[in-house]
A protein has these predicted regions:
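A conserved amphipathic terminal alpha-helix motif
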Residues: 450-488
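NAD(P)H-binding glycine-rich loop region in Rossmannoid oxidoreductase-like domains
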Residues: 42-46, 50-113, 124-131
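N-terminal Rossmann NAD(P)H-binding glycine-rich loop of SDR-like oxidoreductase domains
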Residues: 5-31
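Hydrophobic ligand-binding cavity/cleft-lining segments
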Residues: 298-301, 305-397
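Beta-strand/loop substructures that line and gate deep hydrophobic ligand-binding cavities in soluble
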Residues: 414-453
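Oxidoreductase cofactor-interface core, primarily capturing Rossmann-like NAD(P)-dependent enzymes
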Residues: 19, 128-241, 258, 265-266
Length: 491
């Protein structure tokens, strides 16, 4: 047994405890050695005593060194992560920026570890991507980040996935069960092509270790395209319920979200991106993977039957059982995460952005709040006559190309008894189009009810000011380039 396990390729799966990740895990465990990456120390402890060839690692995807260690020994890596749920007691920033930072860390770590292939399960997008809603746009950005290194990336794009534990499936079943009469907005006439979770897993398995799929992007879906309206009625048939519907000629996205939130039984934070995504029609484009998949694909009815119990209730999400304990850990850790996107001036490196930040800081808050910069690398935030509030110290040994890191090393506003060291980083992303300024694992000394209404807002104000400064520099560069071009043309 040990010998056969040692010969098998090793697959690292991040997002392995979610509904899709759990199905992938079960399908792959007989053929591969598996590394499950989880941000939850609770899950890492619960799953610690695994079978041969199975390993769980606690891995904070916001920490590039933790991700590097997490992917150590992996031949392949599957990325099934999104940031819909909080990872810190206070999280500031857009979900898109949190997702982008994690994907960038993952791609860099995969390259550093010599991973042979990455697989990513993304979202179907329409042919015209100029006006995408945020949920779809951020999935494309994750694709771009994962594909930015030398590691071959294979992307599968799916729409609605019908499987045990899925959030949107619970929403669908609750709506059908709770509403005998449904008044549907016009966007429910748009077509979708739901796919069974089992078929998603089949597609991932076919791609893994297959050089023909390197660098490829494939749309995948079930055997039938249907409108959302039809999908609701077919779901009612599976549940043995008679439902009446009428369609009204209006879009009403806000009303749709409110209606779904009231009757769908899922948090508002999840309703908002789900409805935004559903309203944009995206069809599965013909491709070889879809042709192969459709031959044995499950119908909507078969997929639903496999996803509910004998009473027609959705099977539980694998994460639900431990979530209260995970929330308690997040609260006990009491740290802050703040990620803000900023423009990157042309020809600026991450080092240039960090240097500009230190040059800009002394202008901040004068004369009451002063920032002194030592040797261009250490910043002291001082409040007269109180003393030093924060000290930022540049970490040269942890600042590779594209990333500049500062540790929070002291100050009156820092809880120095915390388990983690707070840090500020500037990360160049999306091919240099943007910079992410991120605070991680900062432990405030102020009581939380005071911190949230003072220091937390002050940090956002500082980041807003620096963003404006970078926008001004970008505009200056553009104007200078136009003037230079004009002079050259006239001469």
């Amino acid at each position: 047994m040990v010998e056969s396990v040692s010969r098998r390729p090793t697959v690292a799966i991040t997002g392995a405890t979610g509904s899709v990740g759990t199905a992938v895990w079960e399908a792959f465990r007989d053929d591969y050695n598996l590394i499950g990456l989880t941000r939850s120390p609770v899950r890492a402890r619960v799953n610690a005593n695994s079978a041969p060839g199975i390993e769980w690692r606690h891995c904070d995807l916001f920490d590039p060194y933790a991700v590097r260690d997490g992917l150590d020994g992996a031949d392949y890596a599957i990325y099934l992560v999104h940031s819909m749920l909080p990872s810190a007691r206070l999280s500031q920033g857009q979900v898109a920026d949190l997702d982008l930072l994690q994907a960038d860390n993952f791609a860099r770590a995969a390259e550093e570890n010599g991973v042979e292939q990455m697989l990513y399960l993304g979202a179907l997008v329409p042919e015209d991507t100029s006006d995408l809603p945020s949920p779809l746009r951020r999935r494309l950005e994750v694709e771009q980040a994962l594909g930015s290194t030398s590691v071959p990336l294979t992307t599968l794009r799916a729409g609605l996935i019908v499987g045990a534990g899925g959030t949107w499936l619970r929403l669908l079943l609750n709506l059908v069960r709770r509403l005998p009469v449904m008044v549907l907005p016009s966007w429910t006439q748009a077509e979708t092509q739901p796919i069974a979770l089992q078929d998603v897993v089949r597609a991932l398995k076919k791609c893994l270790g297959n050089p023909a799929t390197h660098g490829a992007t494939h749309d995948i879906g079930g055997p039938d395209a249907m409108s959302y309206h039809e999908m609701l009625l077919r779901t009612a048939d599976v549940l043995g319920l008679e439902r009446h519907t009428t369609t009204v000629p209006m879009e009403s996205p806000r009303l749709s979200k409110l209606w779904v939130w009231l009757f769908g039984g899922v948090p508002w934070a999840l309703v908002n991106p789900i409805i935004d995504s559903l309203r944009y029609q995206a069809q599965v484009q013909p491709n070889e993977m879809q042709d192969w998949l459709k031959r044995d694909a499950l119908s909507l009815e078969e997929a639903l039957d496999a996803s509910v119990d004998e009473r027609g209730q959705p099977l539980p999400n694998p994460r639900d059982e431990l979530r209260p304990r995970e929330d308690a850990v997040i609260r006990d850790q009491s740290v802050v995460r703040s990620v803000q996107r900023m423009p990157c001036p042309p020809d600026f490196s991450a080092r240039d952005v960090a240097d500009e930040y230190l040059r800009w800081l002394p202008r901040l808050g004068w004369p009451v709040l002063q920032v002194h910069v030592e040797h261009g690398r250490v910043a002291h935030f001082e409040l007269r006559p109180v003393g030093t509030l924060l000290t930022l110290r540049f970490a040269a040994d942890r600042s590779p190309d594209g990333r500049q890191l500062f540790f929070v090393t002291g100050g009156l506003l820092v809880d120095e008894d915390g388990d983690r060291s707070g840090r500020l980083e500037f990360r160049k992303v999306l091919g240099g189009k943007a910079v992410l300024a991120a605070i991680h694992d900062f432990s405030p000394r102020l009581p939380w009810y005071i911190y949230n209404t003072t220091q937390a807002l002050a940090h956002l104000g500082v980041m807003w000011g620096f963003r404006q400064h970078l926008e001004h520099l970008s505009q200056q560069h553009t104007e200078s380039a136009l003037v230079s071009s004009s002079v050259q043309s006239s001469s």
